């Protein structure tokens, strides 16, 4: 979490994932993260742009849109499984003043707002490489082979490949999945390098590269 991120002396970009919000709400969690990052090299980004060394970074959580599947039947099954198995909808609130819980509808609304924000940013001229950083995955290419066809994939992945082919950032970094990814959507390299869970000190993702360095 933030204590880990604060120990780095280099600029560190922090994009909240779903677990950051557990036991709290969307508004309070973001405010707390920004407060905790003060006085450090950590930049907490949510629909925020940051430029460094001639590179433009665009970052947002990018909650799932639950439109991954084409057929209504598959979408309905995905929503049913999500509400049955995903803890986001029981452990995340919306604001500190109301008891309303996070829902797939709110997730989709936030997704659409984030995509509109990205569209606006890519509509602005920038003479240099652009890196997008999200928590949730932007392409079915990030689905692990053993989970292909699972209705729960809608909770992890949205399909922004058409937009990526138009925008063509040089790099898209994401989290949420528990396996490593490195593939291309057009000229955009999509990379995930998660540690995964670490029960009893063991790293879930054996392909995790703690010193991964990406050059572009």
Ranges and model annotations:
Residues 51, 144, 150-170, 178-216:
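Binuclear metal-dependent phosphoesterase catalytic core
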Residues 25-29, 106-117, 152-156:
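Soluble or luminal CAZymes and related metallo-dependent hydrolases
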Residues 58-131, 136-147:
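Active-site-proximal loop/helix segment associated with metal-binding centers of metalloenzymes
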Residues 37-42, 117-129, 162-170:
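A structural motif corresponding to the C-terminal end of an alpha-helix
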Residues 20, 50-51, 62-65, 136-140, ...:
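Short, solvent-exposed loop/turn segments at secondary-structure junctions
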Residues 13-18, 43-47, 131-134, 164, ...:
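Active-site neighborhood of phospho(di)ester-bond hydrolases with catalytic His/Asp-centered motifs
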Residues 35-53, 57-59:
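Metallo-beta-lactamase
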């Amino acid at each position: 979490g933030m204590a880990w991120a604060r120990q780095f002396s280099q600029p560190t970009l922090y994009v909240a994932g779903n677990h950051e919000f557990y036991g709290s709400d969307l508004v309070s969690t973001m405010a707390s993260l920004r407060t905790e990052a003060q006085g450090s090299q950590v930049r907490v980004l949510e629909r925020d742009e940051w430029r460094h060394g001639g590179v433009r970074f665009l970052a947002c959580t990018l909650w799932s849109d639950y439109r991954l599947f084409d057929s209504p039947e598959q979408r309905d099954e995905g929503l049913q499984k999500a509400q049955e198995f995903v803890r986001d909808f029981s452990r995340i609130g919306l604001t500190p003043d109301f008891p309303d819980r996070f829902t797939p509808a709110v997730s989709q609304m936030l997704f659409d707002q984030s995509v509109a924000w990205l569209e606006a940013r890519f509509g602005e001229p920038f003479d240099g490489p652009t890196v997008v950083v999200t928590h949730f995955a932007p392409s079915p290419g990030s689905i692990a082979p053993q989970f292909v066809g699972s209705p729960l994939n809608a909770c992890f992945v949205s399909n922004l490949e058409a937009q990526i082919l138009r925008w063509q950032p040089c790099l898209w970094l994401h989290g949420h999945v528990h396996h490593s990814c490195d593939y291309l959507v057009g000229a955009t390299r999509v990379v995930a390098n998660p540690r995964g869970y670490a029960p009893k000190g063991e790293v879930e993702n054996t392909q995790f590269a703690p010193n991964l360095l990406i050059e572009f």
